[in-house]
């Protein structure tokens, strides 16, 4: 045991001796050399004012220059601190620019009949309105009366019609668009037809979108303001109906104007045109660009699986679809994705409660950067101004009644005239921008260095080199002192 301790002491002394010999090979400068080093730095540095302190023999002038330098450094530190504090508040500015163009892209227009289902089909399935409210709940949260959900009629229908396809029912018995319902269609002076519309499902059942997607880019531009899309629709009030209590009591068409790259969103955004009216819609194109966090609230890294372009509405639909598919094992047909379609029993027992759970727990939120669906980094909107006039006039009523082989009363109660035009051939860009970028911050800091101290990046490197050299000398000095102390306090080695 004693032999082991002696070996350890000998090894430690040997190691300490090697370190001491290594450090001793780096001779420390003498006090005279260190003073000369400090003097040379003061005389050669590009930090203005220091050489005036070093070379002045007059003590008063030396003190004045010392006060000037310290004051300048204090102001410099204060200015740089304020710049950094301002930068890390992530300030932004908003720029608005109006771009005039020769041709401007025309938006997509999605329209639906406020009377959603055929009267004959509704008479056979009187509960269809309530069932559709349950199904369309995936698009908009709505209160479903507890009395209705638990009514014997509802439970009996859901239990005995598990193979009932709400999708097929709506598609076959909802509003349709053909040459009878689309009486006249004109886009920029050219005739259009039902083939130019794409069928989509919304909370209004069967809807139809003009200029949807990216497959008609050669068709969706107009070059003259005041000309655009003209539609004359027949809503067939006698053929289609709706329940005035949970449904709609109006007769006419609801439509929404949106980007061709995005799905229609009606909730709170739809425009209505009643029968017997001519709706003149004047639109403008407004593009908005948001900054990513921390300057703004958008997240450019979020991509949607089922949509080409990100939108908050599309993101919310995908979010709901993920939760429902995971917890219910099926997918509502109004939501995007691939999966087994939910039947009525699954809608009733699983989908509807899960939607309430998602809302209560905030599982699909929108708006801020840390929400499920933050705001879009880029979005295009079409603010609209709508004016109405009675349609048709008495003379036009007689003309249309003869042309369509209908009574004048039918013409007044079923026709809807919609006209959508651009007000001007321009679009407005509202862009959120960084108030201070990194290059601007560096330029500002550099300007403060030059203003108060006549310094630059090279000056900072000079100062760093000066302090590093002094730190190196002090470090070696203290290490040598520590080694000497350890060796002196070590017990003498036995012979």
Swiss-Prot record:
Residues 83-459 are extracellular. The chain crosses the membrane at residues 62-82, 460-480. Residues 1-30 are annotated as: Binds the plasma membrane and stabilizes the channel in the closed state. A motif (GAS motif) lies at residues 454-456. Gene3D superfamilies: Acid-sensing ion channels like domains, YojJ-like. Disruption phenotype: Knockout mice lacking Asic5 have impaired motor coordination which is associated with altered electrical activity of type II unipolar brush cells of the vestibulocerebellum. It comes from the Eukaryota. Expressed by cholangiocytes (at protein level). Detected in cerebellum, brainstem, kidney, liver, hepatocytes, lung, intestine and embryo. In the cerebellum, restricted to interneurons in the granular layer, specifically in GRM1-expressing unipolar brush cells of the vestibulocerebellum. Coiled coil: none annotated. It is a multi-pass membrane protein. Disulfide bonds join 112-207, 185-192, 298-377, 315-373, 328-350, 330-342. PANTHER family: ACID-SENSING ION CHANNEL 5, AMILORIDE-SENSITIVE SODIUM CHANNEL-RELATED. Belongs to the amiloride-sensitive sodium channel (TC 1.A.6) family. ASIC5 subfamily. This is Bile acid-sensitive ion channel. It comes from Mus musculus (Mouse). The gene is Asic5.
């Amino acid at each position: 045991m004693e032999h082991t301790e002696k070996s350890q002491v000998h090894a430690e002394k040997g190691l300490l001796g090697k370190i001491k010999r290594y450090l001793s090979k780096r001779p420390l400068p003498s006090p005279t050399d260190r003073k000369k080093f400090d003097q040379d730095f003061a005389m050669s540095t590009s930090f203005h004012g220091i050489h005036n302190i070093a070379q002045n023999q007059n003590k008063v002038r030396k003190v004045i220059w010392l006060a000037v330098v310290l004051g300048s450094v204090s102001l410099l530190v204060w200015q740089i601190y304020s710049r950094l504090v301002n930068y890390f508040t992530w300030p932004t500015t908003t720029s608005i620019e109006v771009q005039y163009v020769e041709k401007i892209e025309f938006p997509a227009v999605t329209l639906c009949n406020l009377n959603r289902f055929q009267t004959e089909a509704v008479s056979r399935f009187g509960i269809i309105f309530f069932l559709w409210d349950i199904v369309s709940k995936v698009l908009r949260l709505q209160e479903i009366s507890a009395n209705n959900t638990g009514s014997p009629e509802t439970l009996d229908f859901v239990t005995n019609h598990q193979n009932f396809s709400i999708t097929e029912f709506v598609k076959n018995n909802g509003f349709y668009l053909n040459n009878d319902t689309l009486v006249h269609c004109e886009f920029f002076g050219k005739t259009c037809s039902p083939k130019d519309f794409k069928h989509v499902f919304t909370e209004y059942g069967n809807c139809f979108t003009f200029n949807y997607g990216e497959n008609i880019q050669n068709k969706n531009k107009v070059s003259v303001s005041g000309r655009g899309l003209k539609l004359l629709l027949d809503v067939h009030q006698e053929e289609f109906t709706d329940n005035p209590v949970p449904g709609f009591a109006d007769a006419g068409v609801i439509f929404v104007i949106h980007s061709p790259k995005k799905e229609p969103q009606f909730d709170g955004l739809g425009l209505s045109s009643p029968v017997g009216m001519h709706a003149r819609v004047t639109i403008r194109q407004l593009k908005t660009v948001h900054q990513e966090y921390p300057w703004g609230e958008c997240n450019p890294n979020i991509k949607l699986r089922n949509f080409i372009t990100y939108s908050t509405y599309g993101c919310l639909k995908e979010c709901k679809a993920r939760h429902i598919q995971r917890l219910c094992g099926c997918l509502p047909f109004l939501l995007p994705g691939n999966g087994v379609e939910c039947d009525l029993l699954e809608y009733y027992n699983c989908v509807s409660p899960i939607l309430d759970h998602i809302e209560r727990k905030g599982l699909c939120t929108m708006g801020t950067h840390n929400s499920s669906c933050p705001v879009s980094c880029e979005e295009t909107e079409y603010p609209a101004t709508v004016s109405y006039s009675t349609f048709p006039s008495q003379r036009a009523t007689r003309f249309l009644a003869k042309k369509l082989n209908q009574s004048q009363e039918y013409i007044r109660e079923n026709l809807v005239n919609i006209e959508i035009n651009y007000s001007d051939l321009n679009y407005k860009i509202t862009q959120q921008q960084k108030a201070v970028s990194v290059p601007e911050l560096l330029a500002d800091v550099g300007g403060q260095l030059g203003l108060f101290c006549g310094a630059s990046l090279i000056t900072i490197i000079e100062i760093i080199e000066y302090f590093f050299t002094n730190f190196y000398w002090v470090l070696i000095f203290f290490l040598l002192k520590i080694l000497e102390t350890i060796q002196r306090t070590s017990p003498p080695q036995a012979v």
